[in-house]
């Protein structure tokens, strides 16, 4: 009889614990999403922003701040991009993007809020080419987000970008990503 009561108490306690866990679990998951402060923006950059390294510069900001998204040339000479990740990091990236590259001019950035895509885990430059490197065949240059989600130093960005560039290019374009080593 004593064993029977002990068994029922144990079952009752276990059932209560499961109910508490199931009730708390969704709240914890929601809190983690809020703690990450994930947001997304879409933007268009006008001015002299094509054939001046602009999309690669945007991707380097994504690498530094570990942001997902994409950058693509528009037929009207502008660049379209999306950034997704930590809101403060997006703001930092946008500051640099608004300054442009050394070769760009008349840079004007307009942004708007965009929907967050839970499955987006990369930043892609669509159809990337490089006049200064002699790369005319378009490649999609893809940066997979880092885990853990960290900000890295500017000096580390170039090495990561060169690695993903070299993994994207093929054939006669192999070895051309590093401008410092091109003859």
Across the structure, where does each feature detected by a protein language model lie?
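Bacterial N-terminal signal peptides that target proteins for export
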Residues: 2-14
């Amino acid at each position: 009889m004593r064993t029977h009561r002990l068994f029922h108490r144990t079952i009752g306690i276990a059932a209560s614990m499961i109910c508490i866990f199931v009730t708390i679990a969704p709240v914890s998951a929601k809190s983690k999403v809020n703690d990450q402060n994930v947001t997304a923006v879409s933007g268009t950059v006008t001015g002299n922003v094509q054939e001046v390294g602009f999309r690669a510069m945007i991707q380097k900001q994504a690498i530094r701040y570990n942001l997902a998204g994409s950058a693509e040339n528009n037929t009207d000479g502008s660049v379209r991009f999306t950034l997704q990740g930590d809101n403060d990091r997006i703001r930092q990236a946008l500051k640099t993007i608004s300054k442009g590259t050394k070769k760009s001019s008349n840079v004007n950035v307009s942004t708007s809020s965009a929907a967050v895509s839970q499955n987006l885990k990369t930043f892609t430059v669509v159809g990337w080419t490089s006049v200064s490197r002699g790369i005319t065949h378009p490649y999609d240059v893809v940066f997979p987000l880092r885990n853990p989600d960290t900000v890295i130093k500017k000096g580390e960005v170039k090495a990561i970008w060169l690695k993903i560039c070299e993994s994207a290019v093929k054939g006669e374009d192999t070895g051309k990503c590093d401008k410092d080593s091109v003859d």
